[in-house]
């Protein structure tokens, strides 16, 4: 593998992998390695965790039957090249602790399933907990049982990634209240060391109180009040509540009246200032916040039928959007709340676009003590927890941390208002001539979307210093990572 493009090729090849279940490449390995698991770890930003899953020395002399077994429709994944070229090392993490307290309750790790279809039956939750998830927030339930539509999902695609964003039309649980309570009871009995959270939704104060009481009686650890589902078919439920401060306050009080365990208020992002309903929740007795729920959306229009997605007998409706695309929105709301003088003292369970250990720890660095995941599980399965746990432990070890709690809030001081940013210095981009392939992408973007600070000839791109403002658009669009940052210097005349 050509060294100067090695990291880029490894990334491209691992993203090409279809991440098969019961993968043929692993079955074909004569040495007992798990190449599918190896590739998956790299895909989920855990290359050091991949180290123990194959032996580069053995693989270097192997004829790679794993590659011949690959079922990819457009050529085999270069498994052997990736294994023998990866810069990684074994890191012992035996003394790293992922345990953390959340809302006064100890969790073996902060990684939870969020309230959705991925946590909607006993068997599903049990499978997830067996694989290592620290807890589950069971699919929202109440006295109201909805009818669901078909189909109920659509996606926003980008190149060959089908899940940049994900839209759903699902509502609350379609099981009876008795069934849901029975499942929660079994889960807590069979998994006493895991955190079981009941997500509830009532139509009036009496229902909120009753649901809280019944949930505590079956042994759940925490109650989450769902004030934020954006696609409820019934008025006065879901995000309609989360946008109404009076209802938020009344329903939190009603929930607290029915139980003695911690209560979280789940916030809607379909509002300008999340601090307002969050403060109303806390002042009414909530013990913490969960954020964010999904963003109201339309994912697209079929320009031949003029139907939107997902099409339900020719129609659709505005509903919740999730996945990687909403992560920046979630991080912004988390930051707003954790910088609030009152809210910063209360625990937040972070939700929105989390796929990897790195995503999860970004939420924690901005103040979350806990995170929740749905869309990534729908796309890749519960197995993503393996690299969340491994990757987080390796990161903590490399950083010299003993406990994951040391990361919480670490990034907050680096986020300031725009008027406090340094405007007296600049970082100019530098083109790596060895890596540059002269494709001209930087030139096009700089000329048409920047400051006309790149000249282009047969020799490739050249930065025009007098025009460059250091915006770094060129660096971000370069397809081979051939543009780097230079040393920060004072602006001319400053």
What spans do the regions from the language model cover?
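Ferredoxin-like iron-sulfur electron-transfer modules
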Residues: 2-23, 48-62, 419-438, 452-470, ...
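Alpha/beta enzyme core
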Residues: 126-131, 135, 203-349, 357-362, ...
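Glycine-rich beta-alpha junction loops
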Residues: 74, 117, 141-143, 204, ...
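C-terminal helical cap(s) of enzyme catalytic domains, especially alpha/beta-barrels
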Residues: 146-162, 300-318, 365, 376-401
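N-terminal capping/small domains of soluble enzymes
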Residues: 91-196, 202-206, 388
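Iron-sulfur cluster-binding cysteine motifs and their immediate structural context
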Residues: 19-44, 59-86, 363, 441-459, ...
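Flanking helices and flexible, charged tails adjoining ferredoxin-like Fe-S electron-transfer domains
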Residues: 1-6, 74-95, 394-402, 406-421, ...
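Iron-sulfur-cluster electron-transfer modules
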Residues: 39-108, 116-119, 133
């Amino acid at each position: 593998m050509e060294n100067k493009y090695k990291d880029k090729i490894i990334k491209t090849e691992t993203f090409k992998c279809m991440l098969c279940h019961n993968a043929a490449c692993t079955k074909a390995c004569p040495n007992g390695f798990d190449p599918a698991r190896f590739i998956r770890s790299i895909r989920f930003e855990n290359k050091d965790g991949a180290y123990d899953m194959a032996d580069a020395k053995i693989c270097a002399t192997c004829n790679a039957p794993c590659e011949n077994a690959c079922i990819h429709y457009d050529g085999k994944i270069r498994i052997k090249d990736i294994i023998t070229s990866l810069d990684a090392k074994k890191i012992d993490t035996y003394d790293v602790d992922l345990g953390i307290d959340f809302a006064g309750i100890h969790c073996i790790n902060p990684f939870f399933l969020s309230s959705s279809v991925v946590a909607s039956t006993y068997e599903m939750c049990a499978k997830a907990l067996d694989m290592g998830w620290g807890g589950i927030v069971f699919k929202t339930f109440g006295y109201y049982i909805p009818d669901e539509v078909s189909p109920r999902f659509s996606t926003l695609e980008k190149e060959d990634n089908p899940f940049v964003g994900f839209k759903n039309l699902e509502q609350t649980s379609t099981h009876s209240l008795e069934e849901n309570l029975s499942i929660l009871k079994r889960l807590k009995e069979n998994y006493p060391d895991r955190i079981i959270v009941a997500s509830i939704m009532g139509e009036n104060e009496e229902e909120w109180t009753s649901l809280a009481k019944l949930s505590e009686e079956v042994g759940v650890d925490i109650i989450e009040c769902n004030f934020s589902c954006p696609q409820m078919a019934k008025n006065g439920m879901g995000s309609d509540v989360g946008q109404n401060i009076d209802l938020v306050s009344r329903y939190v009080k009603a929930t607290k009246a029915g139980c003695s365990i911690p209560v979280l208020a789940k916030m809607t992002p379909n509002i300008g200032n999340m601090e307002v309903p969050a403060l109303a929740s806390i002042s009414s007795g909530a013990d913490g916040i969960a954020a964010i729920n999904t963003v109201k959306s339309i994912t697209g229009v079929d320009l031949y039928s003029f139907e939107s997605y997902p099409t339900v007998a020719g129609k659709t409706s505005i509903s919740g959007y999730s996945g990687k695309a909403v992560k920046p929105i979630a991080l912004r709301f988390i930051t707003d709340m954790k910088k609030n003088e009152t809210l910063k003292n209360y625990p937040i369970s972070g939700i929105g676009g989390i796929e990897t250990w790195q995503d999860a720890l970004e939420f924690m660095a901005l103040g979350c003590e806990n995170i929740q995941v749905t869309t990534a599980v729908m796309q890749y399965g519960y197995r993503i927890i393996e690299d969340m746990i491994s990757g987080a432990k390796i990161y903590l070890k490399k950083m010299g941390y003993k406990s994951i709690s040391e990361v919480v809030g670490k990034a907050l001081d680096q986020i300031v208002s725009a008027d406090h940013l340094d405007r007296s210095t600049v970082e100019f981009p530098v083109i790596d001539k060895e890596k540059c392939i002269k494709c001209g992408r930087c030139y096009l973007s700089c000329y048409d979307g920047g400051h006309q600070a790149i000249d282009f000839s047969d020799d490739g791109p050249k930065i025009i210093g007098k025009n460059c403002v250091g915006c770094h658009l060129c660096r971000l669009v370069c397809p081979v990572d051939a543009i780097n940052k230079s040393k920060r210097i004072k602006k001319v005349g400053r």
